[in-house]
A protein has these predicted regions:
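Bacterial Sec-dependent N-terminal signal peptides
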Residues: 1-31
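Beta-strand acidic-aromatic groove motif in beta-rich domains, primarily in extracellular
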Residues: 57-66, 147-149, 230-231, 415
């Protein structure tokens, strides 16, 4: 078995190298799903899962800058990205390519290969359902990051070399439909890709719970834009069963030895560089709360803890470093946890989307996060007993927003930023050198205006411009505390 696993990893590595060296021009991401690759579907699934967690959990600006958007970290030297300059290194273009070409394209290929093979009908249905769930998840990342994106004409260059952009709200509506269809395909107790699925081992029950949790997240996202849709979908998801324990976490098993190590280790240890310190935004929030996760989240190189001023050079030796737990090469990647789902349920109750006990869900979210990092339920109980932490329904956006933010530290900057855009908590700092607030979206790739100009202009105009402060459809100005969340 070990030899088989090693062979799979070797083939995966070869595939990843081939992908990374392919052309990154416009045709490179808008490929034709009618001409699938000759790679077996199993290897495509393994590759997509690895690529997804690599790109989304990394701290490297070559992959994403979500941990800057969440102000988890600051930079010791390079200040373009902490000050929200996405144009210099084409940050928007990099993520665009990875999501379309390296993930959605491979999943489209895998779907066609599975549809054409001779698997038993039940196995084929489970495989197709799993692929569809992954596709929907990746599409939500695209929409939540950019707003309007190519959708109906994407991945089909033989017919649409220059694809039109669909409206973000319309895409979400179709993604709900597709997720419901995927859940019909997934059979409780069924199996799909088995060992090729490194997240859930092909376990359909796990994928069903994740799909329902994703539906819940999408419903909470759209609540301020379409309360009716949000109520329907949140209720469906909750009643069908979401991730409730850490055993169901949407997590990836990075390995202790290269090449499949956690990308945080690559940037923080293997690189030999000292580029990152913890931002004052995070340090100033967690330390006064007497949070039991503090000695895990933060290194003790500076006592008392001192966060780097966000958006300006912060000498590595003078400020608090990222906790050594995040320097572990085999630390699992985490993109959805039972803790996050509990916070989503609390938010759904407060928004009137589902019935239930918001305080109970909130307490569960806090407890599960602390248990995940410290292993201590006693720590969680003592923490929740503090007046600054205990639930207060009249301040639910502050309490849920703050504790969800703390729970997502260094694991999922994207979700931390997305939650902040809805709840506007906790307070974020203005980037010191640029004077800019936290962006509401990524800008489009630098070359879209030249290559796909007509469609780019239409999409940008519909959103109020291709600007950092333009909003995706669910980020409603004036909803609740919208417009808050920023401090000098």
């Amino acid at each position: 078995m070990k030899k088989i696993n090693k062979m799979k990893k070797l083939i995966l590595l070869i595939l990843l190298v081939a992908i990374s060296t392919s052309c990154e021009d416009f045709e490179g991401w808008n490929v034709d799903k009618k001409n699938p690759s000759e790679v077996p579907a199993d290897f495509l699934i393994t590759s997509v899962e690895y690529t997804l967690f690599l790109r989304m959990t990394s701290i490297s600006v070559n992959y994403n800058i979500f941990k800057y958007f969440a102000q988890n970290v600051g930079s010791t030297t390079y200040q373009d990205e902490p000050n929200y300059d996405l144009r210099n290194r084409d940050i928007g273009g990099t993520l665009f390519i990875y999501l379309y070409r390296d993930m959605l394209n491979d999943l489209a290929d895998a779907k066609q290969i599975v549809a054409d093979n001779n698997d038993l009908a039940s196995v084929k249905a489970n495989k197709l359902g799993m692929i569809e769930v992954l596709e929907v998840y990746i599409w939500t990342i695209l929409v939540d990051t950019y707003g309007n994106v190519p959708y109906t004409q994407a991945l089909n260059s033989s017919e649409f070399l220059l694809p039109a952009y669909d409206e973000d709200e319309a895409i979400y509506g179709d993604l709900f439909r597709r997720l419901d269809q995927a859940l019909l395909f997934l059979e409780p107790g069924g199996v799909s890709f088995s060992d090729a699925d490194l997240i859930y081992g092909g376990d359909s029950d796990m994928w069903i719970a994740f799909a329902n949790s994703l539906k819940l997240k999408m419903a909470v996202r759209v609540a301020d834009a379409d309360a009716g849709m949000a109520t329907q979908k949140a209720t469906e998801a909750y009643n069908a069963g979401v991730i409730m324990t850490s055993a169901g976490n949407f997590a990836y098993p990075f390995e202790a030895s290269p090449p499949n190590t956690n990308p945080l280790w690559t940037s923080l240890v293997q690189s030999g560089r000292s580029d990152f310190i913890v931002a004052n935004t995070f340090v100033d929030l967690i330390v006064p709360l007497n949070d039991p996760r503090t000695p895990i989240y933060l290194d003790d190189n500076q006592i008392p803890y001192v966060g780097g001023i966000y958006g300006t050079n912060s000498p590595f030796a003078n400020y608090t470093h990222i906790g050594t737990k995040f320097h572990e090469s085999g630390l699992e990647g985490l993109l959805m946890s039972s803790s996050e789902v509990s916070f989503l349920l609390a938010e759904a109750v407060e928004k009137g989307l589902i019935g239930g006990d918001a305080e109970g869900f909130y307490n569960s979210g806090v407890t599960q996060s602390i248990e995940y990092w410290t292993g201590s339920s006693d720590d969680a109980a003592a923490y929740l007993a503090q007046p600054t932490v205990s639930y207060a329904s009249g301040e639910w956006k502050d309490r849920i927003g703050t504790q969800k933010y703390l729970s997502l530290y260094m694991t999922n900057g994207f979700e931390s930023w997305s939650s902040w855009r809805i709840l506007d908590y906790p307070l974020m700092n203005i980037a010191l050198e640029s004077g800019l607030p936290v962006p509401r979206r990524y800008v489009y790739p630098n070359d879209e205006a030249q290559i796909n100009g007509v469609n780019y202009e239409a999409a940008s105009s519909a959103m109020g411009g291709d600007e950092l402060d333009s909003r995706v459809f669910w980020d409603i100005t004036g909803a609740g505390n919208a417009g808050a969340g920023i401090t000098d």
